[in-house]
Amino acid sequence: MTGGSRGIGLAIALKAARDGANIAIAAKTAEKHRHLPGTIYTAAEEIEKAGGRALPLVVDVRNDSMVYEAVDRAAQKFGGVDICLNNASAISLTGTLETDMKKFDLMHQITARGTFLTSKACIPYLKKAANPHVLNMSPPLDVRTKYLGRHVAYTSAKLVMAMCTAGMAEEFRKDGIAFNSLWPRTGIATAAIEFAVSGKEGLKSCRTVDIMADAAYVIFNKNAREFTGNFCIDDIVLYESGERDFDKYRVDPTRDLGSGDYMIPETMPLPPGVSLKAVR
């Protein structure tokens, strides 16, 4: 997995670790960030404590040789690759005139190119796996202007991830490799979102990382040959798997969860009985 030293990526890793999973964490954070918690080494410690085996790897997903070497090392240590989780991303929710080109390039190199590269490096190993999955942390592929008109640089990078899902699902369907995307209905309470978007107060109107971890777990356990090319929303995935208690994922039940993420189309409404309004 890429970008798993904290937040959603780490939560997904810990969920899998409780089943004894072997997890390679490919991320840049070898030393503590001045604003954000966690490194690949602290993440590895948490994974091992949860019951998994961890391989922390310092990787810049913009660097081809580092990505290929990391995938090869993971395959050699664990005997193959069953799942590729493209979680690494860069975010800047700015308009066109406010986005400098350095930030634009960073988002597209990490989010878009990094997803393509990491998937490409994993595919030869995934072809040999029993139930191979690639999961991209991207929104549904919807290019209507109402979505693109907000934060064009960031949104377009995330939509390239979605295009990788759609295109590779078709390209590698015959190989039995599943390519799917997963996206949250609401804001998710992570240190990165607190720092870059909402602040501490804004986190109270979010769901916890557990909802994304639980949804990813459901996807990974589906038959790869039957479930591919899907754009999944966290609460829909869980509802369809039988979950009915979504209030447990709220950071603060007394706060509304907002109107939902701007990149989720109207064709993917809330599951029956699920509300974003405060519950008490």
Regions found by a protein language model. Name each.
Residues 51-53, 80-81, 113, 126-140, ...:
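Active-site loop of short-chain dehydrogenase/reductase
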Residues 181-182, 200-280:
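C-terminal helical subdomain
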Residues 82, 90, 97-117, 135, ...:
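Catalytic Tyr-X3-Lys loop
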Residues 127-128, 132-174, 183-188, 198:
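Catalytic loop of short-chain dehydrogenase/reductase
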Residues 19, 166-177, 223-225:
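Active-site-adjacent segment of SDR/Rossmann-fold oxidoreductases
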Residues 72, 76, 93, 101, ...:
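Amphipathic alpha-helical dimer-interface segment in Rossmann-like NAD(P)H-dependent oxidoreductases
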Residues 37-39, 68, 76, 90-105, ...:
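Conserved mid-core segment of classical short-chain dehydrogenase/reductases
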Residues 1-26:
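Canonical Rossmann dinucleotide-binding motif of NAD(H)/NADP(H)-dependent dehydrogenases/reductases
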